[in-house]
């Protein structure tokens, strides 16, 4: 008989349970066989391991820690009901972990014999206390901070609020783990976020970057946070080899994270958590192949060392290259990521350094439909770009973070980092005028350099005022950025004839106009973003009612210069206050109702550098507002969420008037997105894991110039998005699993006038994996096929720039991972 480890421990009210009551619902360790390796007293082990236990009642946190570390523990719930814990983040031995959690609480860990322990008040010698035989299951999975199956984490980092349990925050949050990344062979951040029905991906403007839409609003890759800091990650494409967790926050987040550098992310934000050295040494080598001839490898090494394993190092090296599944397209990528950390009794320090380089030759271009109809997509493998087109993206970045426990209730933190970006490339977008594919090929050469610095500092703590608990957060943040750009291009009249369905190669065009010096790009933008935030989460009725209130004061200083002339095109210095209100009600152990009212604030958008009448024009800051309500369900092994929301934000679009060849980019009116979301994740049945969801969205434009587009739907926003992803363990074949995923996305308008649109599409993916042990090494074989039917479809329309991105063709991915 097999007993599943308990994954959730509810908090109990002292009014319902007497002194000798069991502190938590638990499974007896004696019910299941215990390997001999675990028979020794785990408290005597000097090995350290990483923990990510969210803040909560001290009893709950102790129970989770004991279960993960394998310590049979008994204690009296009534003694701990009034004590709050900040949780446990980082690497600890079992002894140092208990010492950290119990420090200042007035309680000690006592042996009960036979490797069992209890928690009792500090008493004089000779005093005694009667305890019943309560235990915490010491055989609990090390992944207790995830739902069953390990695909989704129970906690996430939420900006100034810190690491929080998802069910205890009044927002819609999901966090995908490194296990999800590995099993799906997700090479980029876009591959990971595709698991959520609220997110879809498109190509960026011209240079093959990844752009996401969350709740129907864009998120640029350079507006993604790294351990809570903006401006440090690679600007266009983020690879996943060094990623431990991807935290997705849905909705405006000006209070949570502050203003994003480029002004996107109103519909949601993403935070990347890097890998750290674990208590068990990491020795992993992966070799992989993807169609057509892309091969690569990934080496992941981690080790803790020093006294009590206080020092840690994690190194990830990866390289891939070859032809993709798109005809004549080749890609090469390199990654070096080094993470170092130190964990003392009170002080924790971590550093992260990375270098990433991406090279794309003849990457399939975006398509601009500039006629009265939208052409049907060509074959899924077709490439209509020019053989002289290419893009190279190179990023070097680093970050240092430190935390110090001032006492048992307050922790101070500080962090800072910097990044240098160098981008270059020649691009050949296609402008299609009719359903026969009649087109013209454009040309753009655009080097771009960028330097960012980012810093954060704050104080987190907790205290009680009578029966009310408080979780206080104070934070300061700042980001300083400088952008340098230049370009060479051809006039509209000089674009060369071509065809979407029968593309021809043309010589590289002669430049007809340019901006700045391509060998020494001039400064085109500077931004300085500073903010201060304070919040308090008040807990009532044994923390079953949680009220979050907060405010962030933000200052945006932006300067911009025209790339061609060098003339100043923007100069503003504005300060804006953004509040947040949130409520969580937990009437039952497995149910949380939540509601929030939160705002978004973003640096105003910048018009594209070409193909508009106002290139590089910078607009003032935009404020958006969201109201949201929903319910979260947690059944230990799996969870589900249901929510409704309304987002109001100023709308930006490129308007093309009849008879004009170039449109004008402007902030024109207001866009309202109303949506309904449903998600389920975890393992509802033994051996069956789900990542499923559905999103329904209604958008409407209002207050537009002269009412020209009032009542229309916003461009690039589907009416619905469905996801169904499953993994099934094959009975009788240990370590083997099959997987499948269906993605369904509704039709979208391409322009604000709603005269051009693309239809709905469906994509099916299949996969399998098999893990086994050979010669004391664990080997995992994986195979995935994306877009099994090789369906040709327009995957997305830009939300602002009127271009289309075609979906990827059928792609086979296989890999072999050896843990040694």
Question: Where are these predicted regions, by residue range?
Answer:
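Surface-exposed extracellular loop regions of Gram-negative outer-membrane beta-barrel proteins
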Residues: 359-371, 480-484, 580, 584-628, ...
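Conserved C-terminal beta-signal and adjacent last beta-strands/turns
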Residues: 595, 627, 714-820
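Acidic, small-polar-rich N-terminal luminal/periplasmic segments of exported/outer-membrane proteins
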Residues: 72, 86-89, 132-280, 629
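Acidic/polar loop-and-plug regions of large Gram-negative outer-membrane beta-barrel proteins
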Residues: 320-324, 337-405, 418-450, 495-521, ...
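Gram-negative outer-membrane beta-barrel transporters
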Residues: 541-542, 646-648, 666-752, 817-819
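Outer-membrane beta-barrel translocator/receptor signature
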Residues: 241-244, 253-336, 342-348, 396, ...
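Membrane-embedded beta-barrel scaffold of Gram-negative outer-membrane proteins
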Residues: 401-417, 421-427, 594, 620-683, ...
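Structural signature of Gram-negative outer-membrane beta-barrels, strongest in the C-terminal barrel
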Residues: 341, 450, 469-481, 523-649, ...
């Amino acid at each position: 008989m097999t007993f599943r480890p308990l994954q959730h421990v509810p908090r109990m009210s002292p009014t319902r349970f007497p002194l000798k009551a069991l502190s938590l619902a638990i499974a007896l360790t004696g019910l299941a066989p215990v390997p001999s390796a675990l028979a020794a007293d785990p408290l005597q082990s000097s090995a350290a391991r990483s923990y990510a236990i969210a803040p909560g009642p001290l009893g709950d946190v102790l129970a989770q820690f004991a279960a993960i570390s394998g310590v049979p523990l008994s204690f009296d719930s009534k003694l701990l009901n009034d004590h709050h814990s900040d949780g446990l983040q980082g690497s600890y031995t079992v002894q140092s972990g208990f010492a950290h959690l119990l420090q200042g609480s007035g309680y000690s860990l006592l042996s009960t014999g036979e490797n069992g322990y209890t928690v009792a008040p500090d008493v004089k010698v000779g005093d005694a206390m009667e305890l019943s035989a309560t235990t915490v299951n010491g055989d609990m999975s090390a992944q207790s901070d995830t739902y069953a199956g390990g695909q989704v984490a129970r906690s996430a980092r939420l900006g100034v609020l810190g690491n929080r349990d998802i069910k205890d925050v009044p927002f819609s949050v999901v966090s995908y783990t490194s296990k999800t990344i590995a099993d799906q062979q997700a090479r980029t951040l876009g591959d990971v976020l595709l698991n959520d029905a609220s997110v879809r991906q498109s190509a960026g403007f011209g240079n093959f970057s990844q752009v996401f839409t969350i709740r129907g609003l864009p998120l640029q890759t350079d507006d993604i946070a790294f351990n809570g800091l903006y401006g440090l990650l690679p600007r266009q494409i983020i690879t996943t080899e060094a990623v431990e967790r991807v935290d997705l926050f849905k909705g405006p987040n000006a209070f949570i994270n502050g203003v994003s550098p480029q002004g996107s992310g109103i519909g949601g934000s993403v935070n990347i958590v890097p890998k750290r050295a674990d208590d068990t040494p990491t020795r992993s080598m992966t070799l992989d192949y993807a169609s057509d001839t892309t091969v690569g490898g990934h080496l992941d090494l981690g080790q803790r060392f020093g006294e009590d394993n206080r020092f840690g190092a994690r190194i990830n090296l990866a390289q891939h290259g070859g032809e993709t599944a798109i005809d004549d397209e080749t890609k090469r990528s390199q990654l070096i990521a080094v993470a170092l950390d130190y964990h003392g009794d009170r002080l924790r320090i971590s550093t992260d350094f990375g270098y990433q380089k991406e090279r794309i030759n003849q990457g399939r271009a975006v398509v601009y439909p500039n006629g009265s109809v939208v052409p049907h997509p060509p074959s899924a493998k077709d490439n209509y770009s020019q053989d002289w087109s290419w893009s190279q993206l190179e990023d070097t970045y680093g970050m240092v973070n430190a935390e110090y426990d001032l006492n048992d209730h307050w922790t101070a933190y500080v962090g800072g980092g910097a990044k240098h970006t160098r981008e270059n490339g020649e691009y050949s977008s296609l402008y299609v005028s009719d359903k026969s594919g009649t087109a013209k090929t454009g040309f753009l050469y655009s080097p771009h350099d960028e330097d960012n610095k980012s810093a954060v500092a704050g104080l987190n703590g907790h205290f009680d005022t009578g029966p009310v608990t408080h979780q206080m957060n104070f934070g300061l943040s700042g980001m300083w950025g400088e952008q340098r750009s230049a370009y060479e291009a051809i006039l509209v009249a000089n674009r060369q004839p071509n065809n979407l369905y029968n593309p021809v190669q043309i010589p590289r065009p002669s430049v007809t106009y340019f901006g700045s010096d391509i060998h020494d790009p001039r400064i085109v933008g500077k931004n300085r973003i500073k903010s201060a935030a304070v919040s308090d989460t008040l807990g009532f009725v044994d923390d079953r009612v949680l009220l979050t209130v907060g405010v962030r004061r933000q200052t945006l200083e932006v300067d911009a210069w025209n790339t061609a002339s060098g003339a100043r095109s923007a100069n503003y210095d504005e300060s804006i206050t953004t509040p947040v209100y949130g409520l969580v009600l937990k009437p039952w152990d497995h149910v949380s109702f939540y509601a929030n009212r939160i705002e978004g604030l973003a640096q105003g958008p910048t018009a594209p550098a070409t193909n508009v009448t106002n290139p590089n024009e910078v607009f003032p800051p935009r404020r958006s507002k969201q109201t949201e309500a929903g319910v979260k369900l947690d059944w230990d092994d799996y969870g589900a969420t249901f929510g409704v929301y309304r987002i109001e934000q100023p709308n930006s679009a490129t308007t093309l008037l009849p008879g004009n060849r170039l449109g004008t980019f402007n902030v024109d009116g207001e866009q309202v997105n109303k949506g309904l979301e449903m998600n389920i994740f975890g393992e509802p049945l033994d051996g069956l894991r789900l990542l499923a969801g559905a999103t329904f969205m209604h958008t409407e434009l209002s207050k537009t110039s002269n009412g020209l587009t009032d009542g229309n739907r916003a461009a690039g926003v589907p009416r619905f998005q469905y996801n169904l992803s499953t993994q099934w363990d094959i009975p009788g074949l240990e370590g083997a699993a099959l997987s499948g995923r269906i993605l369904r996305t509704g039709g979208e308008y391409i322009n604000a006038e709603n005269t051009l649109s693309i239809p709905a599409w469906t994509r099916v993916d299949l996969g399998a994996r098999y893990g086994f042990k050979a010669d004391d090494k664990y080997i995992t074989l994986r195979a995935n096929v994306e877009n099994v039917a090789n369906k040709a479809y327009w995957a997305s329309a830009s939300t602002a720039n009127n271009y289309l991105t075609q979906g990827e063709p059928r792609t086979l991915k296989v890999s072999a991972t050896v843990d040694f």
